[in-house]
Design a protein with these regions (language model features):
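Conserved acidic residues
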Residues: 62, 115, 138
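Short alpha-helices
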Residues: 163-188
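Glycine-rich Rossmann-fold phosphate-binding loop(s) that bind the pyrophosphate
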Residues: 42
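C-terminal substrate-binding/catalytic lobe of Rossmann-fold NAD(P)-dependent oxidoreductases
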Residues: 36, 47-51, 55-107, 194-195, ...
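Rossmann-fold NAD(P)-binding glycine/threonine-rich loop
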Residues: 124-167
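Rossmann-like NAD(P)-binding element
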Residues: 91-129, 142-148
């Protein structure tokens, strides 16, 4: 089966399972427990997380926040998600009503009715938000944008799921760290040790963001190493990794150039590495020369062609013909859709 068919099958399986879950078992599940979820920050990541939560039988969205009345509110209304203001300021809350939206209160009001909050707000406001969540006595998850030191726990499903069970709160690591973990953790689990050097070729901004750049430059991240590689060690400390990064004028995806040093006696070949990744969820491997998918533009077109919502590609995209193991050194390229790979 080709990858195009494989991707469609994955989507169909998800849809079928959702139908089954929403069928005869739904009432039974709802009788047991429904987790009330708040989304603080209904933007690029928040709207995707909200839909993922809404698809679950044992969870419900009790509210999403916006800083001000804007076009994102229309989507929340269509989805049936109650709107709250990010702030508790009376005038800011009233602005929603003046713009024609029903606003159910401020963030404090939302936290009072939630069991857990998923924080999808911009970075650098996490510390103050965390204080509010702790005071409200609810669980919390930060969707990237914050440092491990602030949250004390980090999470990605491919690396440390069980270690995060029962904690008061955690952060989902960034899109780049998530992507690195997806392909590096299987290698580490096979080899027992791993040393990695990688370069992040980062998109300048998300497609819907008109305020960032560069638009006519290549901008190196002059903090060395960049945070992406060391962040992998917050979810899998045993992997030794460093990274550097540059931002380029595109909005589509990030690309990683990875050089991994495997231990002596690893027993792997290029083919067995590809087979290992093929067995993992959320990794798509395609041959660029055979398919014509040789750039991130075609990868995103592929995601649209298979009918993905918002044109998302939740999987990490690996070019098969860009993978080569020579002795103990593994070279490969992978592409990361920054808007969706961190979504549950």
């Amino acid at each position: 089966m080709d990858v195009f068919s494989k991707a469609n099958v994955k989507d169909e399986l998800c849809q079928n399972q959702r139908c089954v879950n929403r069928g005869s078992s739904r009432a039974y599940v709802l009788r047991i427990m429904t987790i009330k979820v708040a989304i603080n920050g209904y933007g690029t990541i928040g709207k995707r997380v909200a839909d993922a939560v809404d698809a679950q039988d044992d969870m419900e969205i009790v509210g999403v926040t916006k800083t001000r009345p804007a076009f994102g509110c229309d989507l929340a209304v269509r989805k049936g998600y109650p709107i709250f203001c990010t702030y508790d300021d009376v005038d800011r809350i009233a602005a929603f009503g003046a713009a024609g939206y029903t606003c159910h209160g401020g963030l404090s009001d939302l936290l009072e009715i939630a069991d857990i909050v998923v924080d999808c707000s911009p970075g650098k406001v996490g510390a103050s938000n965390k204080d509010k969540y702790v005071a409200a006595g609810i669980k919390w998850i930060f969707q990237g944008g914050e440092k491990h030191a602030m949250t004390e726990h980090s999470y990605t499903s491919s690396a440390n799921h069980t270690e995060n069970l029962g904690v008061a709160g955690t952060r989902v690591v960034s899109c780049n760290t998530t992507g690195l973990s997806r392909t590096l953790v299987p290698l580490y689990e096979h080899c027992g040790s791993l040393s990695v050097e990688c370069t992040m070729i980062r998109r300048a901004a998300d497609p819907g963001d008109s305020s960032k750049g560069p638009i006519n430059a290549i901008k190196p991240v002059l903090k060395v190493p960049s945070h992406h590689g060391p962040d992998v060690m917050t979810v899998k400390p045993e992997i030794q990794i460093n990274s550097m990064a540059v931002a380029v004028p595109t909005t589509l995806m990030h690309v990683h150039v990875v050089v991994a040093t495997l231990p002596e006696g690893h027993g792997l070949t290029t083919e067995s590495v590809l087979s290992m990744w093929n067995e993992r969820p959320r990794i798509v491997i395609m041959n660029g020369s055979e398919t014509g998918i040789t750039t991130t533009a075609e990868v995103m077109e592929f995601a649209r062609d298979i009918g993905r919502k918002w044109g998302d590609l939740h999987e990490i995209f690996v070019w098969e013909d860009g993978v080569k193991l020579e002795g103990n050194t593994l070279y490969y390229f992978q592409a990361i859709h920054q808007e969706s790979d961190v979504i549950p």
